[in-house]
Amino acid sequence: MNDILLISVLGVGSYGAKAMNMIMDKMQKNDQDDTFITNKNSNEFVFYAIDTGSQTLTNSKVQDSLLLSDALDQESLADQKLEEKLQQMVGDSDLVILVAGMGGKTASTLTPAIADRLKAINIPTTAVVFKPFGFEGEKSEQNAEIGISKLAKLVTTLKVLENNDVTAKAQNQSEQQIFAQVDSEVADFVLSFSEKHFVA
């Protein structure tokens, strides 16, 4: 009996799409690291990205991607056949993990919409998202809160990372090091699902 799970990791928005490259690179590094044991019993990961910006998707190393228009209201998403395209993309998955940086219009609106469609087609879904830094402004914070509130009702597991917490812990570190820490936490969460004993 093959109980290895097919896990689709779906990056949403600009950060989510970029994060797919970072997670894949870390997975490859772990596979080459003698201290990290990967074997044939590990779950299988496939990576995808959805965004409204073509440049982000062009630079992504994912297996497949989906470019949507900037119109993200329910009617527009229906016109773009989002549910049908998700079915084609991840319909065979045992679990979908959504990755997004909340605060901007795309991720804050689209991530809950995707989770809603995945729930409609009965695909177990979890998500890891992070809230914006304080300097990104009140509007970004409001967008993130609304998006996260909606998302929490649609996924089985939701991990919310606080960028401000990362900043507080990262005293005397460069901006690049802070962003790398955020990326690392996202990757660690996703790759924690690699062992086959995980049950969706």
What kind of feature is each model-predicted range?
Residues 1-200:
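Tubulin/FtsZ superfamily GTPase core signature
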